[in-house]
Amino acid sequence: MIELKNYTLNFGPQHPAAHGVLRLVLELEGETIVRADPHIGLLHRATEKLAETKPYIQSIGYMDRLDYVSMMCNEHAYVMAIEKLLGIEPPLRAKYIRTMFDEVTRILNHLLWLGATALDIGAMTVFLYCFREREDLFDCYEAVSGARMHATYYRPGGVARDLPDTMPQYKPSRWHSEREIEKKNHNRQGSLLDFLWDFTERFPHCVDEYETLLTDNRIWKQRTVDIGVVSPENALQWGFTGPMLRGSGIAWDLRKKQSYAAYDRVEFDIPVGKTGDCYDRYLVRVEELRQSNRIIRQCIEWLRKHPGPVKVDDYKVSPPRRVVMKHDMEALIHHFKLFTEGFCLPRGEVYSSVEAPKGEFGIYMVSDGANKPYRLKIRAPGFAHLSSFDDMVRGHMLADGVAILASQDIVFGEIDR
């Protein structure tokens, strides 16, 4: 009698659907997945250890590079941990700015997820549509920090600087006519808040376009409905958070349950799924795009009416303004010491978490009283989600494994750390 053996397939890390550097060792029976073994570590950069060798303020930039699609949300968890140990509270205007940019970041993340997932499954048009909107939001990042991705904008005690009164303008070149430049600059004549307000007025129509292409699309539903079903009980046991947990029907959102920044001052709804499949997770993220847009509009309205400080007035934690520094020797000394030695935190330990686009992103920090952390532990939401991949994918076809992996929204910067 012929002995039949299962086929072993290496999926990634070079595969375009591997979401970075994921290597999957799949055991197949025909085209049905019997077992999946994720191999991680190919993007390990020792971020936790690096942060333990530098003053607190110098590690903010490392946070951007963990989940490099949810930059400011990662920064938020880190600076909140420092603020808890210091016992300081940022000004209310800084809280609103953080809330607004957290939601800008959420839209950036979900747009990339939607475009990449559609591309993995075979719908290319959505990818181009999503990147059209992402460019406008990257312009907002650039306006406040000078960088389009790794902003390093949040600071212990607030944010680096107030919102700008002008937006960067496109300049004439030999590749673009004056008419094209004028069209590109028509909504950049005012402040950042004006530019963002214009975006929030256009964006719901853009989301409608995505849904027209996908939500009732027969092929899209065949590829996502009843694929990768996770029950509420299993979702909790695996440690799911964010859209993965809400897609299984559990309305858990740190912005509501353990409110931080200005989330207790804005109104929004928590979308939840019913069956816990890939389609439900898609619907949850699409509705989160609309809710984030709603939160941003509320923040803009408040920020327009309430000018004020954006960081604490304590030179031990927050650098003095450049104008003051150039006229006051003491302020210059504070500035020099802050960016060379940094500041020391009281002895203690703290856990700080935010509702990042992928789930609960947490920072566990232990201080021994020095100017750098004794221990820094990063809780990445994608790590728990990827752990469940074998359980989610068993019994599905090989092509469905791509859809399930895409629905988890995996980014290896935070998983490997």
From Swiss-Prot:
GO cellular component, one term: plasma membrane
UniProt key word tRNA processing: no
Membrane topology, record value: Peripheral membrane protein
Keyword terms: Cell inner membrane, Cell membrane, Membrane, NAD, Quinone, Translocase, Transport, Ubiquinone
Cross-referenced HAMAP family: NDH1_NuoD
Subunit relationships: NDH-1 is composed of 14 different subunits. Subunits NuoB, C, D, E, F, and G constitute the peripheral sector of the complex.
Protein name: NADH-quinone oxidoreductase subunit D
Organism for this UniProt entry: Legionella pneumophila subsp. pneumophila (strain Philadelphia 1 / ATCC 33152 / DSM 7513)
Gene label: nuoD
